[in-house]
Curated annotation (Swiss-Prot):
Binding-site residues for Mo-bis(molybdopterin guanine dinucleotide), renumbered to this chain: 83, 144, 169, 173, 256-258, 341, 345, 451, 497, 524, 642-651, 728, 745
Taxonomic source organism: Symbiobacterium thermophilum (strain DSM 24528 / JCM 14929 / IAM 14863 / T)
Location within or outside the cell: Secreted
This enzyme's EC code(s): 1.9.6.1
PTM field: Predicted to be exported by the Tat system. The position of the signal peptide cleavage has not been experimentally proven.
One GO term of the biological process aspect: nitrate assimilation
Binding site for [4Fe-4S] cluster: C46, C49, C53, C81
One Pfam match: Molybdop_Fe4S4
Top-level taxon in the UniProt lineage: Bacteria
Stated name of the protein: Nitrate reductase
Subunit and interaction comment: Component of the nitrate reductase NapAB complex composed of NapA and NapB.
Length: 754
């Protein structure tokens, strides 16, 4: 059979292709491999997105010989997408794998011993701290770090060195989601879970190409649509992508106008009596940018967002806006909203999250099976490691804040440090951290398990900054950041180590170690402990003899009314994850937060109680529409948005090592509407040049295909790691004023035939 992208997708059992073909997805069987005879199978979790799919790994003679979906895991029930299906490939390759410590000498990275590399790292960090103070150093981590890794890094930098310059790449993907949760409910992470999919009647998907970014979730949605009664899907997106294939209503709004659209939905819901006055009275309050307002004032605010007024802003028809609002608010039907980077990666990302919650709070469609606003997460432990672990510059573990003295005292008591050595000042957020590396404020920077030399916006500026600081990178594969490093430390990869991940539905899961690390690679925890010891903080870290010891200490950060209650490490090793809070009242975990009888922190008789707020009430916000930081003009007449395809992940550090994926996915590309292409004389497959105010790249034009942007919009894949094709040379580093998350999804470019 001829090997085409279509056959590749089908052969890989991708849910989207199977649904399009009219058949139901089935669990992926392991590839036939005689080596599995006599192998040992280990329970673990997928290394890629935030869904948290269970994976079984077969190892024999210190080699991964097979992987398969874990049929006992309730998240994926045996299904794997193409990335998970080929996880064995990334474990067995040595192409691009970092096998020894490297030190830059005479401009070249050269092999070194662990002692030489670690001593150099400690010496340069100690020099910076002693001469320029604790805020002259920083740590940039990842939603791919294990929870234990984030915990140790946090303690080292915040508890011992005394700086809050601890950031992570969840700032680039989930910070606005966090800010939305905190401002609306007072607590981070969702009240619902993935089981809501099987109960929902209406799915409202906005800012998410779920079919390609979260394919296992999409497979569950399509199964629900196929098997449920009168299940509807509404898609709101500037680009027609795979989800549109199953959408009953498709709303291709003009880029950057979705806040106006969400306000229009709220206006219709109230105008047509689809709201729930009793729920609103008992469980909500109202605010605008200046403080408390009344329901009547909120209704008055919405009069600027009638469908007729919003139609010319969004480019949609009033009738389509009303039809979608009626479906979302329909009485007797359960609505689940799902969103991801299209909402979060915006300068109004926090407000957009608020506006989504408004719809569920106005209708009372929340905290019930199937009635669920559900924020999707992009990395396997952005929640469990960074958000819950406090791995950002304003956070401490389990929802605490660095500016709160009592919080610092609580954390210091567990860490065994004097709380006065902990800074009360918020550290640099991600973009400011890299600017500080460029202008001399940060003298030494440690990066773990992420590739900012490819992934951050306004990349010309970022890469220049990385060349000016003492840069240490801990990673498993060479990438566009390791090439800039002064020291590279080889990290253990996935099932070469054990630990904890936390997924998008509050599910904490254990990853087993199946094989030893390749070459001289070491687990990140080991590396961080060695750095701590060499910096002179060994007394605070010497008791960490295993990941279990670290986890059990982290558990002490929860409990005590924080709402972050976790099970002992041993339980996670045995079970397929538990959704927190987990305690004596709810030993099996919590299905729905804020619900009496399910969430152990809801007072008796309260029914639903949003205990993150002092009055137990969620906030409905009046959030006005605001244009993106950059819109097209005569010089840069196109909108640009960036994103991903199903087969690849992030900066392809791992997926490029899989020949089947590279061959099947084909060339990376830039999508352009056929009318725009014709006007510019561009044909499918031509090279095009894209230029923004920050840089330029070339790309291969895709005219028609799996997705189609609207006229005036071009969509560029984020994955390509070739210098002349790095999408983030173009993107805007403007940030949301609350969350400090960057606006990857909307900027202005010029498009020309190359």
């Amino acid at each position: 059979m001829k090997f085409t992208r279509r056959s590749f997708v089908k052969a890989s059992a991708l849910a989207t292709a199977m649904v399009a073909a009219g058949c139901s997805p089935q669990p992926v069987a392991p590839k036939q491999n005689p080596e599995t005879e006599g192998a040992t199978w280990y329970k673990t979790v997928c290394r890629y997105c935030g869904v948290g799919c269970g994976v079984m790994v077969a190892a024999k003679d210190n080699r991964v010989v097979a992987v398969k979906g874990d049929t006992e895991n309730p998240v994926n029930k045996g299904l794997l997408c193409v990335k998970g299906y080929y996880l064995d490939r990334i474990m067995n390759t040595e192409e691009g794998r970092i096998l020894k410590p490297l030190i830059r000498k005479n401009g070249q990275l050269t092999e070194a011993s662990w002692d030489e590399a670690l001593d150099l790292v400690a010496a340069r960090f100690r020099e910076a701290i002693d001469q320029h103070g604790p805020d002259s150093v920083g740590f940039y981590g990842s939603g791919q770090n294990l929870a234990e890794e984030t915990y140790i890094a946090n303690k080292l930098f915040k508890g011992c060195i005394g700086t809050n310059n601890v950031e992570g790449n969840p700032r680039t993907c989930m910070a606005s989601a966090v800010a939305g949760f905190l401002s609306t409910f007072g607590k981070d992470e969702p009240m619902g879970n993935l089981d809501d999919i099987e109960h929902a009647d209406t799915f409202f998907i906005i800012g998410s190409n779920t079919a390609e970014a979260h394919p296992i979730i999409y497979s569950r949605i399509t199964t629900r649509k196929q098997t449920g009664k009168d299940v509807k899907v509404i898609l709101a997106d500037p680009r027609r992508h795979r989800v549109a294939d199953i959408a009953d209503i498709f709303l291709p709004f003009r880029p950057g106008t979705d806040l106006a659209l969400l306000n229009a939905f709220a206006q219709v819901i109230i105008e047509e009596g689809l709201h729930d006055p009793d729920f609103i009275e008992r469980h909500t309050t109202f605010q605008d940018g200046n403080g408390a307002i009344t329901f009547e004032q909120y209704v008055a605010f919405l009069q600027d967002y009638t469908p007729e007024k919003v139609a010319p802003i969004t480019g949609l028809s009033p009738d389509d806006i009303r039809a979608a609002a009626r479906e979302i608010g329909a009485r007797g039907r359960k609505t689940m909203t799902l969103w991801c980077m299209g909402i979060n990666q915006r300068t109004v990302g926090t407000w957009l999250n608020n506006a989504i919650y408004n719809l569920h709070l106005l209708t009372g469609k929340i905290c019930q099976p199937g009635n669920s606003p559900f924020s999707l997460t992009g990395q396997p432990s952005a929640c469990g490691s960074v958000r819950e672990g406090g791995g950002l510059s304003h956070l401490l573990p389990c929802g605490r804040q660095v500016t709160n003295e009592q919080h610092r005292k609580e954390v210091a008591a567990v860490w065994g440090v004097d709380y006065t050595r902990m800074s009360d000042k918020v550290g640099y957020h991600t973009m400011e951290m890299f600017r500080a590396a460029g202008d001399g404020r940060i003298k030494a920077l440690l990066i773990s398990c992420t590739n900012p030399g490819h992934s951050l916006p306004n990349l010309n500026s970022v890469r220049a900054s990385l060349e000016k600081t003492f840069l240490v990178v801990m990673d498993a594969f060479h990438n566009r950041t390791t090439e800039l490093a002064d020291v590279v430390l080889p990290s253990a990869l996935w099932c070469e180590k054990e630990g904890i991940y936390g997924n998008t539905e509050r599910r904490t899961q254990h990853l087993a170690k199946a094989v030893e690390p390749k070459g001289e690679a070491r687990p990140d925890v080991w590396i961080l402990l060695e750095i701590a010891k060499r910096l002179g903080y060994g007394e605070y870290f010497s008791h960490y003899t295993s990941n279990e010891v670290i986890w059990e200490e982290f558990r002490k950060m929860g409990g005590g009314g924080t709402g972050y209650d976790y099970a002992p490490y041993e339980r996670y090793k045995q079970e397929r994850g538990l959704r927190w809070p987990v305690n004596d009242k709810q030993p099996a975990g919590t299905t729905l937060r804020y619900v009496e009888g399910d969430d152990p922190f809801v007072p008796e008789g309260a029914g639903i109680y949003f205990y993150g707020k002092p009055d137990g009430k969620a906030v409905i916000y009046a959030r006005p529409h605001r244009d993106p930081a950059e819109v097209p003009d005569a010089e840069y007449p196109f909108y640009l948005s960036t994103g991903r395809i199903l087969e690849h992940w992030h900066t392809i550090t791992m997926t490029k090592r899989v020949p089947e994926i590279m061959k099947g996915a084909g060339e990376f590309y830039c999508e352009i509407h056929e009318e725009d292409a014709a006007r510019l004389g561009i044909q499918n497959g031509d090279l095009v040049k894209l230029t923004s105010r920050r840089g330029q790249v070339v790309a291969t034009a895709r005219v028609g295909g799996r997705a189609v942007p609207q006229k005036g919009l071009v969509f560029l894949l984020m994955h390509d790691d070739r210098t002349e094709r790095l999408a983030n040379f173009l993107t805007n580093d403007a940030v949301d004023e609350t969350s400090k998350q960057m606006e990857y999804k909307v900027c202005a470019v010029r498009v020309e035939k190359a």
